[in-house]
Amino acid sequence: MQPFHPLTRRSFLTTSGVALSTVALDAILARDAGAAEKYRGLAGLPHHAPKVKRVIYLYMSGGPSHLETFDYKPGLDKLDGKPMPESFTKGQPIAQLQGTKLKVQGHLAKFAKHGKSGQWVSDFLPYHAKMVDDIAIIRSMVTDQINHDPAHTMMNTGTAISGRPSMGSWVNYGLGSECDDLPGFVVMTSFAGRNPQPISQRMWDSGFLPGRFQGVEFNSTGDPVYYLRNPKGVSAAQQRDLVDVVGELDRHRNAVAKNSEVDTRISQYEMAFKMQASVPDLMDISKEPKDVLELYGAKPGDGSFASNCLTARRLLERGVRFVQLYHRDWDHHGDLVKYMHLCCGATDRATWALLTDLKRRGMLDDTLVIWGGEFGRTPMFQGKGGPGRDHHIKGFSMWLAGGGVKGGIGYGATDELGYHAAEDVVHVRDLHATVLHLLGIDHAKFGVKYQGLDMKLTGVEPSRVVKEILA
């Protein structure tokens, strides 16, 4: 076997047939080894003083029922089992119940008022009941898309058109990251329950923004990031040399090509190398004190939503700008009670623990927490096994908490059956405008030119900051 000869940048560049002048070669080699340009956001941002500097988005994929979580409607129980009044549904978009005889499904949970604020919360969410004074519940959300994939796309990118940047990518592009050895936008999906619907990686893609701003998915079990470990027999020093050489070649090529995606590739190689050291320590939650693990109900390596919530806090501590946690088991067309117990059992305590932990550490004051799915569920019965509910876009619930958000309030309302958002309607675009505002960004001024258009997260249709929920 031939002995290993250390790879040096000069020897590689001078013997590999790359045509570089002496001046160009010396200029490249004079760069600080492996120094990828640090990105700290766009000039001129933030537009105003931010209330928060980071976001954690708890995404309940599948469409949790507002009528079994936060939206109590006594009138629904009075009409239980009776035909759904046509005045509510005539001409309205309906998913799987289209063409069937519609009947009212009463609440499948018990509701009570909780906290000093007296907010209605169902008995599926006993830990949420403990924290209602910390959250602002929006009960008048609406969206445009009634099927999962386009609805996910709408909630994440502001449009149902595929290929647009996600909200996390927009934030990462605008403000940059405070962390040098982790991505600015991290996504995790919990491992739990039955066979949930998949989530497309488009939901955290950067679209027409440079690829360096896309979300990076960390695995909840096994290796956190695939292919992050060095091949057998390759040391960290050898890997460092290789990354340096590839970066130098890319920079030389890009001096001619001037392609922004080459810069992206350079930064991705550099970030991958740094993550080889940072990610294993980050993901090892066994180092957390026993009382913290017990608070979340987290078990190291189990891939649960609880473990992901704890990991999310660790990501925020290290300066990651935007963290998105998916829990994918909320599509309850039938057996709603059974599956609500499973979903809420997996997420309720962990969500409360996350807010509690952030408060204890003084982090909630400058962190925005978002909870919700892509749409809600119908007030009408759908039967697959036990009673369930179909997709619903005309009124559902989400909540926000953290810096700049009024805790202990409910905003907006649906009608007496929970069908239409009837008061203070909040569209997905309004939610996005509000998130950007809390980060110090004016949504109307934040965009990029693409294919001759001024592209924004909030699009061209009217949108507003929901100032009524802001502290």
Indicate where each model-derived feature is located.
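Ligand-binding pockets and gating/stacking loops
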Residues: 1-471
